[in-house]
Amino acid sequence: ICELPARFTASATLTKIPGLLYSLGGRVDVGLDRGAAPTADAPVVLTIQPGVVIYASTGVSWLAVNRGNRISAIGTPTSPIVFTSRDNVLGLVTDDSQGQWGGVVLLARAPVTDCTVAPAATPGSVNCERQTEGAVDPAYFGGATPNDNSGTMKYVQIRYSG
C-alpha cells in the first residue's frame, strides 16, 4: 500500500505495479488552487496508469484536482482505473453500499451562476466562485473560462463515493 501525499506539488505518475494499492488518507490535492483567472503557470498533472487502484478509508477522503491543474487518468476497457472504498477492497460492500468516501472532484474555472463566495459578483464572471459542499476544508471552483481543461478521464470506475 502506498499512501498518497496530502498535496502533489509537482507532476507525478501513479504506476501500475501488480499487488500495489494507492491510498487516500484524507483530502489529496493535485496542485494548489491557482485562482479563478487563467495563469501562465505550468500545471501540476497527476497521471494515473491503466489498472491502478486507489482506495479511501473514510468519508472525508477525496481527490481534489485544483483549478489550473490536471488529471490524466486514461485506463483501457480491459484495465480500467478504479477509485473505490476500503470496504470494496476488503470485499465488504453490498448492493446498498454508498457514500464510503468523498470521490474525485475536478475544481475548474468554468463559469458558475450561483456566486456563494462573493454573492454580489456577476454570475459567470471571474469573481463568481463557489465552495465544495460537505468538506471540512472546502475547495473553490468557478471563474470565467468556459473551455477550461482539468484533464482527461477515460475508462475510470468511481465506486461507493458520496
Spans of model-derived segments:
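Beta-strand/loop edge motif enriched in small/polar residues
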Residues: 1-162
